[in-house]
Curated annotation (Swiss-Prot):
InterPro entries cross-referenced by the UniProt entry: aa-tRNA-synth_Ic (IPR002305), Rossmann-like_a/b/a_fold (IPR014729), Trp-tRNA-ligase (IPR002306), Tryptophan-tRNA-ligase_arc (IPR020653)
Catalytic activity: tRNA(Trp) + L-tryptophan + ATP = L-tryptophyl-tRNA(Trp) + AMP + diphosphate + H(+)
Top-level EC class: ligase
SUPFAM superfamilies: Nucleotidylyl transferase
Keywords of the record: Aminoacyl-tRNA synthetase, ATP-binding, Cytoplasm, Ligase, Nucleotide-binding, Protein biosynthesis
Family: Belongs to the class-I aminoacyl-tRNA synthetase family.
GO biological process: tryptophanyl-tRNA aminoacylation
CDD domains: TrpRS_core (cd00806)
Protein name, entry field: Tryptophan--tRNA ligase
Amino acid sequence: MPDEFTVTPWEVKGKVDYDKLIVQFGTQKITEELKQRIKNLAGDLHVMLRRNVFFSHRDLDLVLNDYEKSKGFFLYTGRAPSLGMHIGHLIPFIFTKWLQEKFNANLYIEITDDEKYMRNPEFTLDQTRSWAYDNILDIIAVGFNPDKTFIFQDTEYIRNMYPITVKIAKKLTFSEVRATFGLDASSNIGLIFYPALQIAPTMFEKKRCLIPAGIDQDPYWRLQRDIAESLGYYKAAQIHSKFLPPLTGPEGKMSSSNPETAIYLVDDPKTVERKIMKYAFSGGQPTIELHRKYGGNPEIDVPFQWLYYFFEEDDNRIKEIEEEYRSGKMLTGELKQILIDKLNNFLEEHRRRREEAKELVHVFKYDGKLAKQMWEKIHE
């Protein structure tokens, strides 16, 4: 009997069978042919494409068609602000930065301080706005182009978005929104209206919009795809990623509510070492003797999976690590140490860039070339 798994926008449980998920969601697999097209246009392939971390799509082929015809496309992603971001939160942003660089695309990043406030009874609006600022620093630290990126908070940009949002809202029924977003009779009316706000940025330009996100977010965009053409816009295209497994094992995804499952961007080197050594699920054997004899299983080993997803970009080196671990030559502790060193180097550089980002917030939100254009626009 195959393992059962659940993937919704609110919950990821079990060991996900991504091939089955493609069938369930009705998306398309990113084929080798499609990857070759991307490589021909971009000049190379991001590690997350080479290793099938981004594995599924909707209309990515049409996005590439438009690019080849010099129509271009734009990128859209977002963040519901939280008290702290972890490594898993950065995956779509890191990949989006590569797409922006390679395809010279405008990027819109929606910070949903309103939705976070409305969804959680215990949060105040001041709290979610404060978290938004901190999260924006982490996002800017990824390295986006300040003149081609507009970061906006819903509570600040609502006046400019409201006309198109009203048109979107008129096309959506309560029953559709309730089913897609998991609402019920006790949900506040702000949450019922919010999906229209989330769809609005897909209509910021009269080009095709590409959304890089986790596969669990796919249902949110089905509503947009149902109504976009009736408003004179393209259906939003998506490129979907797998979930970076939590430290505790290959099932589910990292959770902010369970600190032991995640490495946070603020974790210091000692915290990183402690978490990896103590919590990172191992595919190794229970003793050194057995490990030397039988080797480890990289498929279920979380430190290996993290290296494979992103932290060891050299394909020859990751193959070497896999072979040494599988043969028993490399021990679990040695594999964990490789990840610890990679993580701490990454986080040290991220913190440096985050400090620099404090001087750039106004550029991304208000003063950059794209930001200025956006504040002069009313979207209708």
